[in-house]
Amino acid sequence: MSKRDFEKHHLKTAILVDGGFYRKRAKYLWGEKTPAKRAEELKDYCYRHLKDNYENRYLYRVFYYDCPPIGKNVHNPITGKTISLEKTDEYQWMTEFLNELKHNRKFALRMGRISDTQVRYSLKAEPTKLLLNGKKKIEDIEITDLALNIEQKGVDMRIGIDISSLA
């Protein structure tokens, strides 16, 4: 079958992946993996999804939406120390993972950015409840009671633009 005949009888299919959601869900379902193995897993998953569910479709492209990791220094309010995010395992893992995805032929990375002003620590839900109920005191707050919040910018907009251009 010629390429023209193939395309006439098969539909081009684009897969859009919310990177932050995918990474969190994949880690929960399939455990921790190296960046190379996680990227290969995503590629295989996309191809398998089309093959198993839609025999008359072929992959046009996988659009992967995420933000590059931020290498900012952040002040920890409990320890008083400054943490260089660029030196964390998460930063290294994410950098390698995005590089792995870049080398996949059918993948297009759509990168947003991380807001420099929106990187901060906040109190997790459970310790907040305990504080409000009087079961925990401010002095008893530990490093594990905090979560580092990092806000993405521009990812949702890129998804919307791609959806409208693919339609």
PLM segments and residue spans:
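Domain-level signal for Mg2+-assisted phosphodiester chemistry and nucleotide/NA-binding surfaces
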Residues: 2-134, 143-148, 155
